[in-house]
């Protein structure tokens, strides 16, 4: 996050790699603004504490995923090989319960198949020793992917920042480096 400029190259690369139609995205970049302007009553001068930052987000492959708990057919499941959460489209009935349960708004309906779909961290690329397309495409190198223990050792364990929900709710496999001034 300290590096993300909001260019959305990761979003476009993901859409292209997964051949997603208009309106369906597996990634998003949320723009956040905080602070405001205030007038000094004594001098009339205006002062600001405005800050803006971008939050690139997709499926966080949570340790306690709400989407998996509500899936009526168990189509949402964890891969044994690497712990990624994926959707088995043969089992999915497109109920949309996973989308309603996900605090990050990740699962989306594929209108052509009437099945749910979401970021799978480019599992096919990972299986061939490659990084997810969002990681490779980011011109600022703001996105990293790897074993969560290694990322936490490198960057710390913070996983909550506005506008994201409290990390204690689903325990996302996510590490956030907040912009200066928002570290606390």
Where are these regions (language model features)?
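Non-ligating segments of multi-cofactor redox enzymes
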Residues: 1-184
